[in-house]
């Protein structure tokens, strides 16, 4: 049995576990897993769609440039959220673990394990490309923030309401007026 055939046979199971583990990194993972409506759940649907496309590209042994669009979709979402870089990108490398779980447990697929080195290398390249995209997204966020600070708009968006500041000051000093 060839590796590509084994991956194709286990495609649905591998994708299901990979998407589940990725969505588990969110505090609202239950909602992300249940709702398939792209309008009610754009994050969950976009991540599932992106990971599915990435897996299919790995199966097709596609050129690295073909990975850019689905990687960009997933990484942009995770780059603007409160994840550390390692948390944001760990799901790409977890695919290795997911594949190993399905192939190491079956006697018929155990002979394929030595063939996983090539797949692991392609997954590593995919993860490195994801890191490049993540770094570019974070840099863009910081550049936007600096531009906002320079323009003075940050004063409007980050400043507390004057009446809220007065209430806080009263609480701290213990005065009622």
For the regions a protein language model found, what residue spans apply to each?
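Long, contiguous hydrophobic alpha-helical segments, chiefly transmembrane helices and signal peptides
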Residues: 74, 91-95, 127
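Elongated alpha-helical scaffolds
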Residues: 86-101
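Cytosolic, long alpha-helical scaffolding segments
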Residues: 81-82
């Amino acid at each position: 049995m060839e590796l590509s055939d084994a991956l194709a046979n286990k495609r649905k199971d591998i994708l299901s576990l990979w998407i589940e583990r990725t969505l588990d990194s969110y505090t609202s993972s239950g909602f992300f897993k249940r709702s398939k409506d792209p309008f009610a759940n754009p994050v969950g649907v976009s991540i599932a769609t992106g990971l599915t496309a990435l897996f299919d590209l790995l199966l097709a042994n596609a050129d690295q440039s073909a990975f850019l669009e689905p990687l960009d979709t997933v990484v942009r979402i995770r780059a603007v959220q409160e994840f550390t870089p390692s948390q944001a990108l760990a799901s790409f490398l977890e695919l290795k673990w997911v594949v190993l779980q399905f192939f190491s447990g079956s006697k018929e697929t155990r002979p394929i394990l030595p063939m996983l080195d090539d797949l692991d290398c392609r997954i590593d390249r995919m993860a490195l490309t994801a890191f490049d995209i993540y770094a570019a997204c974070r840099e863009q966020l910081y550049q936007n923030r600096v531009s906002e600070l320079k323009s003075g708009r940050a004063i409007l968006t980050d400043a507390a309401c004057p009446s809220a500041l007065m209430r806080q000051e009263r609480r701290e000093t213990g005065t009622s007026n």
